[in-house]
Regions:
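Active-site residues of response regulator receiver
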Residues: 78, 108
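Charged docking surfaces used in two-component/phosphorelay signaling
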Residues: 41-49
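Receiver (REC) domain active-site loop signature in two-component systems and cognate sites
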Residues: 81
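Non-catalytic signal-transmission and effector/linker regions of two-component phosphorelay proteins
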Residues: 1-29, 44, 135-150
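Short hydrophobic/Thr-rich beta-strand motif most characteristic of the beta2 strand and flanking loop
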Residues: 51-58, 66
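Active-site beta3 strand of CheY-like receiver
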Residues: 70-76
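A Lys-centered signature of the CheY-like receiver
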Residues: 130
Length: 150
């Protein structure tokens, strides 16, 4: 087995992605929703290193409250969580006037055809299976944030 050694954040996200937003504009904001503490913390580290303003919530219920309060540019949510799963969160967000226009990206380990179909029906902004390369996710979040801002 060949394991790659990670000695710094540069090894995870790539040195070219470590530069903060150089335009002087307000950083794009992302709300990360995942019930696993380690996943939330790593997501925050990676997104902040790539110039995003990132916050996190441990459940769909907590994320909905935070989304109403913070109005992030994009929400990245896991699917399987206690206290409000990803589908329940998407339903709440899309039916509330304060949050219905926030793009939602699903990032899940549930790599099944039925999940993919339901994601299409839910009209998610994007859908990724875990593991997902940080630079790919960051590029999509930048695109969605810029699209929403225009």
């Amino acid at each position: 087995m060949n394991l790659r050694s990670v000695t710094s954040l540069y090894d995870i996200v790539g040195a070219s992605d470590m530069t903060p937003n150089s335009s002087g504009a307000r950083p794009h904001s992302v709300l990360v929703v995942d019930d696993h503490e380690d996943t939330r913390q790593m997501s925050l580290i990676v997104l902040r290193a790539q110039g995003f303003h990132a916050s996190a919530a441990p459940s769909g219920d907590a994320a909905f409250l935070r989304a109403c309060e913070e109005r992030p540019d994009v929400i990245v949510t896991d699917l399987a969580m206690p206290e409000g799963n990803g589908w329940e969160l998407i339903d709440k967000l899309s039916s509330d006037t304060r949050t219905k226009d926030i793009p939602v990206v699903m990032l899940t380990a549930c790599a099944t055809e039925s999940v993919r179909r339901r994601a299409e029906e839910a009209r998610l902004a994007a859908f990724f299976f875990k593991p997902c390369a940080p630079d790919v996710l960051a590029a999509e979040l930048r695109r969605l944030s810029a699209e929403r801002a225009s």
